[in-house]
Amino acid sequence: MPVRFKGLSEYQRNFLWKKSYLSESCNSSVGRKYPWAGLRSDQLGITKEPSFISKRRVPYHDPQISKSLEWNGAISESNVVASPEPEAPETPKSQEAEQKDVTQERVHSLEASRVPKRTRSHSADSRAEGASDVENNEGVTNHTPVNENVELEHSTKVLSENVDNGLDRLLRKKAGLTVVPSYNALRNSEYQRQFVWKTSKETAPAFAANQVFHNKSQFVPPFKGNSVIHETEYKRNFKGLSPVKEPKLRNDLRENRNLETVSPERKSNKIDDRLKLEAEMELKDLHQPKRKLTPWKHQRLGKVNSEYRAKFLSPAQYLYKAGAWTHVKGNMPNQVKELREKAEFYRKRVQGTHFSRDHLNQILSDSNCCWDVSSTTSSEGTVSSNIRALDLAGDPTSHKTLQKCPSTEPEEKGNIVEEQPQKNTTEKLGVSAPTIPVRRRLAWDTENTSEDVQKQPGEKEEEDDNEEEGDRKTGKQAFMGEQEKLDVREKSKADKMKEGSDSSVSSEKGGRLPTPKLRELGGIQRTHHDLTTPAVGGAVLVSPSKMKPPAPEQRKRMTSQDCLETSKNDFTKKESRAVSLLTSPAAGIKTVDPLPLREDSEDNIHKFAEATLPVSKIPKYPTNPPGQLPSPPHVPSYWHPSRRIQGSLRDPEFQHNVGKARMNNLQLPQHEAFNDEDEDRLSEISARSAASSLRAFQTLARAKKRKENFWGKT
């Protein structure tokens, strides 16, 4: 018979058999593979003829591996050959011929024996164990009975053990006992080799016999341990707040005692324990007072205590306080109500006195020249302390510190006051100026470009003369002459503004003029807000212009009184820009912005802080001929004249809030109006806050109405 040589493949070398307690039972010996070989049909338990096999089964032959590739360890080849031959005294001639073939094969097995696959493990001892398996398996293959009629007494001891194992397996299956599944180790997948079948520990023989007895007898109920654990890991680990159980009585214990599953060995011991338990229960019943039994179904309906409910309460039962969530107190609705009232109070208090820096874009817009003056009140020289306290924008600390250090350098005074020559009122440091008689002017320096072009030659001469002359008298005369020029210009502008306001008031309900009328009136081309702004209420919010265009003629006509300045060079432009950024207008009230947006403003802040003078030296209305050049008076310069949005829009382009005829606020205030300053200041603050809160209330009402109409009333 030719020798078919097959060496160990790479797969067999890399993926070794993982040794476990199942690997021994799944050993690939012939007795394990064919446990029914040599057994009679009654021993096999066959009661009917086998059905036809639909698929042809190819017999499996073990690969022949040469002995030179096998390492048998300490086992010598003589031990392999010396296994005893089975004797067959009554075999016919055909069987004798087969026996000769078997002896010839055993002679060849010295060089190339037919060996089944070894079971391998990762340990170093597995090779020696595999070698011993080879020896046993060779003995089994050499002694396999060829004919079923050969008696069991001629089989070897190894074969008889395998047959006994097969019988035991069949008997256990018939008896209904749990049998370890026998898999062919050669056909095991890699998954089956790595993940071994989990089986319970083998039971004791006495317990197995007891099981067989219960299975065979029909009258004795079979005892089977509950192999499936019905209690989940969650129930085992989580011992929540269990409901209060009713006390158990002795009668209940007697009725339910058969529910406990006890092994037969322990039942005899339980009888004595049961008697002791009953005696203890009787003693307990005597000592404990009887409780009124309440049925369990009336204690809690629909609320099962779970881990989630024990750990996570509903959000309504928590309160975030001092950085941690705590349980809610009983007066939670009252606290919410109180907090909402406080928030509403703060909101009303802030309206009209605070301006967000997010709206700086609106302050810097070119459209601010169209707002009119909102107040006609006097200077703040004698503002009382209670009014100053009501003005939230004031800075009392800076008022105290800055007033103590008046500057004595005339150059600084000259530079700073050149930028503020038109100021006719006195301001105390630390008090904002919402009620100052503000002269109309362009919002920022960018609007003054057209007038700069016209007046540059004259202004340069004035600058040179200002640097040379330091006389205060001549400065006062020139300053008053400038005031008279302003009065003449004011009247012409007021007439023009009257025409625009009269045309705008002609609309029935007040509010913005329609777009066709605005086009007829002409003027600056507005943004897309022409179509999107509401007819009544609301301000025009504009985006900053990327390129600063030269101011057209229309803007020159609509400029305010403050657009005339005696000196406008690059230095004063930077100064005015710095001061305007420092004092961000807050709905008419000036506040100090501690975070200037540009670097050039930071350089000039210190100069403005130093230049201060006592208020009493400044005349309110100096009278001088207009021909003199101004040497400016010394005024407190830290609080710059406001370049803020004053009041409501008067330009016909921006008719949003026009509902009543206004008095002409562009006239300079008379001297008699400066008597009762406190009342004017109080009324100004209250009127401004009331107007802003009214607008906010109207906007909120419109939003609520729109929401109700959209979603439907609830």
Curated annotation (Swiss-Prot):
Bias type Pro residues, positions: 622-635
Positions bearing Phosphoserine: S83, S123, S126, S242, S263, S314, S560, S584, S648
Ranges annotated as spanning the membrane: none
Domain of life, per lineage: Eukaryota
Acidic residues compositional bias, start-end: 460-469
Residue spans of biased composition, Basic and acidic residues class: 93-111, 482-501
Keyword list, A-Z: Cytoplasm, Cytoskeleton, Microtubule, Nucleus, Phosphoprotein
Motif mapping: ST]-E-Y-X(3)-F motif 4: 306-312
Gene Ontology biological process: negative regulation of centriole replication; retina development in camera-type eye
GO molecular function per UniProt: microtubule binding
Location in the cell: Nucleus; Cytoplasm, Cytoskeleton, Microtubule organizing center, Centrosome; Cytoplasm, Cytoskeleton, Microtubule organizing center, Centrosome, Centriole
Region of interest called Disordered, as start-end residue ranges on this chain: 79-152, 391-571, 616-637
Motif extent (ST]-E-Y-X(3)-F motif 2): 189-195
Extent of motif ST]-E-Y-X(3)-F motif 1: 9-15
Ranges spanned by the short sequence motif ST]-E-Y-X(3)-F motif 3, renumbered to the chain: 232-238
InterPro entries reported for this sequence: MDM1 (IPR029136)
Biased composition (Polar residues): 138-147
Entry GO CC: centriolar satellite; centriole; centrosome; cytosol; microtubule; nucleus
Protein family per UniProt: Belongs to the MDM1 family.
PANTHER family: NUCLEAR PROTEIN MDM1 (PTHR32078:SF1)
Known function: Microtubule-binding protein that negatively regulates centriole duplication. Binds to and stabilizes microtubules.
Official protein name in the record: Nuclear protein MDM1
